[in-house]
Amino acid sequence: MAIGDRKKIIIDTDPGIDDAMAIFVALNSPEVDVIGLTTIFGNVYTTLATRNALHLLEVAGRTDIPVAEGTHKTFLNDTKLRIADFVHGKDGLGNQNFPPPKGKPIEKSGPEFLVEQAKLCPGEITVVALGPLTNLALAVQLDPEFSKNVGQIVLLGGAFAVNGNVNPASEANIFGDPEAADIVFTCGADIIAVGINVTHQVIMTADDKDKLASSKGKLAQYLCKILDVYYDYHLTAYEIKGVYLHDPATILAAFLPSLFTYTEGVARVQTSGITRGLTLLYNNLKRFEEANEWSDKPTVKVAVTVDAPAVVKLIMDRLMES
C-alpha cells in the first residue's frame, strides 16, 4: 500500500497491556501510519503512561514516532484519579519492571499535539482514544475548530445497554472523566464509539496465548511476557480463561470498520449520582414533545455487533507476523 493511501492515526493511550497489544497491531498494519502517541491516565498515571509509550515504541523499533504527554488531571482539574493497576500491574505492563526508555516526550502537550496535527492535515487524522477522553476534551476547548479539523475519533468507551465494568452503570474510560466524555460525544466530530457491549465478545483464549508464544513474532514474544497478569485478572473478575481485547478491537475499527456494525444516535454521559459515567444513547426513534438533554445534539456511531472471530484472527496474525 502506498504511503499516501495509509490512514494517519494518533493513538491516545494509557498503556496498559491491551494498549500495548493495540499499539503493536497498529504499527504492524500496512493500512495505517501512526504519526504520534498521546498519553493519559487510566490504567496507570500519566507519567507512567508516557514512560510505557516510549518503551513500547523502543521495543517495536519505532522511536521515530513522537510521544506527547497528556494531562495529569481530569477536565475539571480533579487530581483524584481511578487507576486500574490491579488489572495491568503496578507498572502497567505486567509487573515486569522494564528499564527506563531512552527517549523523551516532545515539548508539546497531548492536547496541543492533537490540535496541531488536525490543523496541519484537516480531515485526514483519525484519533484512536483508548483511555479517558480528557486530552480530546481539552483539544476541543483549546481549538473550537478541532472537531471540524479532525477526520474521525474512534474511541473505546461506554457500556451501551449492558452493565459497566467499574460498576453496574459505568465503563472504565468514561468513568475516568465523565465530563470530558460528554464534551467529546457532543462536540460534532465524526465519532465511532466501541463499547464493552462489543469488546466483551472479542476474547483471546489461553490457546491463543500459546500460539503467540510459539510464534516467531518479536512483538508476540514480548506480549507473552506481560500477559499473565491480565489473564489472572480476567479469571478472577469474570471467571474466563481468556482476556477481552478492548483496545486492539478498537484499533481495528479505525481502519477496518466493516468488521463491526453500527447504530447512530445522540450519546450523553451522566455526570453525577450513582450512575456517574453511564452512557445513554438516544436512537432517534421517538420524537419527544419536550426538549431534553439529547435535543439538537450531534449524533455519533456506536458499534453494536462485531465479527469477533475475524477480529481475533487479524490481531493474532498481525502480532505473529511482527
From Swiss-Prot:
List GO molecular-function terms, semicolon-separated: inosine nucleosidase activity; protein heterodimerization activity; purine nucleosidase activity; UDP-glucosyltransferase activity; uridine nucleosidase activity; xanthosine nucleotidase activity
Entry EC number(s)? 3.2.2.3, 3.2.2.2, 3.2.2.-
Q: What happens when the gene is disrupted?
A: Normal seedling germination and plant growth and development in standard conditions. No abnormal levels of nucleoside intermediates. The roots of the double mutant urh1 urh2 accumulates strong levels of xanthosine.
Q: Could you tell me in which tissues this protein is expressed?
A: Expressed in roots, seedlings and flowers.
This protein's UniProt keywords? Cytoplasm, Glycosidase, Hydrolase
Keyword Hydrolase assigned to the entry: answer is yes
Q: What is its main location?
A: cytoplasm
Q: What residues make up the catalytic site? A: D14, H246
Keyword Hydrolase tagged? yes
An example Gene Ontology cellular component term from the record? cytosol
- Superkingdom is Eukaryota
| InterPro entries in UniProt | Inosine/uridine_hydrolase_dom, IUNH, Ribo_hydro-like
A biological process term (GO) from this entry: inosine catabolic process
Which reaction is recorded as catalysed by this protein? uridine + H2O = D-ribose + uracil; inosine + H2O = hypoxanthine + D-ribose; xanthosine + H2O = D-ribose + xanthine
Q: Which CDD domains match?
A: nuc_hydro_CaPnhB
Summarize subunit and interaction data from the UniProt record for this chain.
Component of the NSH heterocomplex made of URH1/NSH1 and URH2/NSH2 which exhibits strong xanthosine nucleosidase activity. Interacts with URH1.
What this protein is called in its record is Probable uridine nucleosidase 2
Record gene name: URH2
